[in-house]
Amino acid sequence: AARVCASRGHQVILYEATADLGGQVVLAAKATWRAGLIGIATWLADQVAFLGVDVRCNQLADQNTVLESDPDVVIVASGGIPNVGRFEGNGLANTVWDVLAGHVECNGQILIVDESGGHAALSCAEFAADHGAQVEIISPDKVLGTELAQTNMGAHMNELYKLKVRIRPDTRLEKLEREDDGLTATLANVYTDLNEDHRFDLVIGEHGTLPNSDLYFALKPLSTNLGQLDLESLTAAWSQTLAPNPEGRFSLYRIGDAWASRNIHAAMLDAMRVCLHL
């Protein structure tokens, strides 16, 4: 979003809560064969620097931050919060982010519950197995990676088999309980509903992300468009003209995971569609 806006001649301020640009791409690039993904973040960072974007790292933008900047347009790209899934005891589960960021140790028996069908759970399984853990991955689908192209799945399956990751399709996690020696996971077949208990040292839930939208909703009543998007104009990459609150101070849009769980390509397409005619 910052690159497109700056390339169109706008003065852009980019607030980044962490020390480096890149967000989830930085984590995704930590997986075994996906290190090249960091090139996306590196290229975009180089582009915004070249275009003169005012990048302010280690600054978590809030409502006051935005209002002090007196903007004409606000793009909320605040990302999402990991969603481990809906099962009894889900508070005992960790996230893919915990593993890839090194916040938990990858050893012992690890269960990964893939309910999104994307790269995240598979990359986590490969990362954990590569660091010495014995990994089992389950999915309610009949195959892994239902949201991925076959070219990507070939690379993933090669890694999973090479690292001896156990794969269990047609399976859901019903319940997770803390025991003295670890975690007990109740796994059920999605067709027969027959279940059985298994012990693990760590359980990782992957169900995409939930929008990190507090800033968006704080700014919404202050905006001319009340945070609304004309979806027909969005999909056609036309200008956004909605203005139900003409007394508002700025136009407000949210993109990527701040709107709904996205992959890299969809998030960048969101940004292009919204910003192309600003």
State where each predicted segment sits.
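Rossmann-like dinucleotide/flavin-binding elements
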Residues: 1-21, 56-70, 77-150, 190-202, ...
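SH3/SH3-like beta-barrel fold
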Residues: 184-188
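N-terminal Rossmann-like dinucleotide/flavin-binding domain of flavoprotein oxidoreductases
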Residues: 23-68, 148-180, 197
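Interaction-prone hydrophobic/basic patches in short secondary-structure elements
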Residues: 137, 178-183
